[in-house]
Design a protein with these regions (language model features):
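Short, low-complexity disordered leader/linker segments with a strong preference
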Residues: 1-28, 54, 58, 101-108, ...
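Extracytoplasmic "Venus flytrap"
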Residues: 26-52, 59-73, 77, 81, ...
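Short beta-strand elements in bilobed, periplasmic/extracellular small-molecule ligand-binding domains
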Residues: 53-64, 150-153, 175-193
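Flexible loop/hinge segments that line or gate small-molecule binding clefts
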Residues: 93-131, 135, 150, 247-256, ...
């Protein structure tokens, strides 16, 4: 099950012997992402590479450095060179749908890890991003803000997971007439910590009154870290920041009592493990259930940060 896969991954057990362990031997697998600079994307790509190589596969990790046009072009390349499988990591398949259709037409299986899912793909392993958004937003609005105040949203809507978290934010804020959204700002994916720090510093200058900003909702941890740095620099340490991902630096900042008060920890190894297991089944000729598979996530606050 998804939960079992996630638990095993969380405890560091990559039990990759559940399917025919020779099924992947000699297969050429293309692990493709535009976001290898992201700590968590890198972690997932590395986990998949190591596990599939342990099964005898030849794994190529291809990073296009935030360039979706280049990603599209590289997908065409691996399809024409006859790859045996594609794993799309942290990338919206809708943005490369035409190229993926070429893979489907060539009977090349496509798996997603922290991506979206489109018809033709086998599986996308992810978190339930809407539910994660709901978890963090309700904690922010109810527990941290007490149902009132102002909030800034730092987002990156090209990422399918971030979009779902933002949709949860958009839906829930309607239920809180005493919470006003000051602005939503797009944070580029290349240097999200630095960019969010700069964006936040500018917003603090534009809202100089100490009480003018109550909270900052960051749709993932890097901008939350950047925002917390800007707040510390400006001496605005009463402003509350939340993130999503549970990356190491963010969890440490929560423990240290910074402005960053909470995040939702995604089980990235759990996602990567689900993908590896499903690939083993696929290449062993077993039927797999197509669609999204979820690795469970948890709310991290100062009480449980480790």
């Amino acid at each position: 099950t998804t939960e079992k896969a996630s638990e095993d991954a969380a405890s560091g057990k990559a039990d990759t012997k559940t399917a025919d362990s020779t099924a992947l031997a000699g297969k050429k697998i293309s692990v493709m992402t535009p976001y290898l600079t992201s700590v968590t994307t890198n972690q997932m790509a590395g986990f998949i590479k190591n596990n599939l190589e342990a099964e005898g596969a030849e794994v190529f990790v291809i990073d296009t450095a935030n360039d979706f046009a280049e990603l599209a072009s590289r997908i065409e390349d691996v399809v024409s060179s006859g790859t045996d499988g594609i794993v799309l990591v942290s990338a919206d398949p809708n943005q490369v749908a035409n190229q993926l259709t070429e893979a489907f037409d060539a009977d090349i299986p496509v798996f997603g890890c922290d991506s979206g899912f489109i018809d033709g793909m086998q599986v996308n392993a992810t978190s339930d991003n809407y539910q994660m958004g709901e978890l963090i937003v309700r904690y922010l609005f109810d527990d941290l803000m007490g149902g009132k105040g102002t909030v800034i949203a730092l987002t990156h809507r090209p990422h399918p997971g971030v979009v779902k978290r933002c949709e949860a934010f958009d839906d829930i804020i309607k239920e809180y007439p005493d919470i006003q959204l000051i602005t939503e700002q797009h944070v580029p994916a290349e240097q999200p910590i630095n960019d969010a720090e700069e964006i936040t510093a500018n917003l603090l200058t534009a809202n100089p009154d100490k009480d003018s900003v109550t909270a900052i909702f960051a749709a993932w941890d890097e901008p939350a870290i950047g925002a917390a740095k800007a707040l510390a620099e400006a001496g605005r340490d009463k402003v509350i920041v939340t993130g999503v991902d549970g990356n190491e630096q963010a969890v440490q900042m929560i423990k240290d009592g910074s402005c960053l008060k909470a995040t939702v920890k995604q089980n990235f190894e759990g996602m990567a493990d689900i993908v590896c297991r499903q690939m083993e089944k696929y290449y062993a000729g077993e039927t797999i259930e197509k669609g999204e598979m979820y690795a469970p996530a948890e709310l991290i606050t100062q009480e449980n940060a480790q």
